[in-house]
Structure formats: structure tokens, C-alpha cells
Amino acid sequence: MTGKRHTSGGEALTDLFLAVFRLSGRLLAAGDRLVSDLGLTSARWQVLGAIAFAPSPQPVAWLARSMGLNRQGVQRIVNEMREDGLVDLHPNPHHRRAHLVALTKRGESAFAAASRLQTPWANALAKGFDHAELAAASRTLRALSGRLEKST
């Protein structure tokens, strides 16, 4: 230990980080339960979402960057989903080896089905929370994510 103490902001941020770590684990477990009947996991669902919301097919490295994950982990999931017929790889005119990842019809259907399950789940989970507080929490987490992205 250095003997240095957190500022009040540093202490609050550390508490937030710990809460986010706990939430992340619980969110992944809940997501796994929610989409398991679709043959998905939270990890696959997350990658499907990144592909679905991208403006056009993207290389794995770009998808990983947009999710704050490492390329190797996303590549493994993309490979599995390709074997299962959820995604296809297309030639990239800008890079011979970095193929573009796109959803297949089956992948689009799986993501749509997961989204249909997520809507009532999220609505139920949001009950009792103030909309403005949730929006403020979302803004804060996005701002922290942006700062961390710039610092690496």
C-alpha cells in the first residue's frame, strides 16, 4: 500500500466499479437464462447485437472494439456462430485477411427472438426505478467508458 487515500470522487468511483463488476456477473447469468432456449448465451447475444446494430458488416476487430472486448474472444464466438449458421464471413475489399462479419437469416431471427424476450424482461426489471435516474446512470457509464477508451 502506498498510504495514499482516495478522494471522495475516487472512493465513489471505486464503489461504482465494484457495483458494476457485481452487476456484470448477474447480468450475464440472467442473460444466459433468458436466451438459453434459443441456443444462445449472453456472449453470443452480445456479439449478435454488435453485428445487428453496426451500420454495415464489420471486421471482428472493429466489433470487438465497439464492445470493449478483445479480438480473440470475439473471434472465437464468431467462429462458433459461423459453424452454427448464425453469421457469415464476407471478403473485405480493404483487408484481405480481416473478413467482414454479417448475420445470416438464421442469425437475424435469433437476434430478433432474443430482443422479443428482452423487452418484457427489461420492462419488468425497470419497474420502481425513476426514468431520470436510469438515464443519468447510463450517461455516467457511457462517459466513464469513453474516458477509459481514451486512456488506453
Each model region followed by its residue ranges:
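Short amphipathic alpha-helical segments with heptad-repeat character
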Residues: F17, F21, G25, G68, ...
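Charged, amphipathic alpha-helical coiled-coil/dimerization segments
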Residues: T2-K4, L28, N79-R139
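N-terminal helix-turn-helix DNA-binding core of bacterial DNA-binding proteins
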Residues: G25-N70
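N-terminal leader segment of winged-helix/HTH proteins
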Residues: M1-L38, A132
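Exposed, interaction-prone assembly regions rather than primary DNA-binding/catalytic cores
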Residues: A135-T152
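Hydrophobic structural patches
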Residues: V20, L48-I51, L141
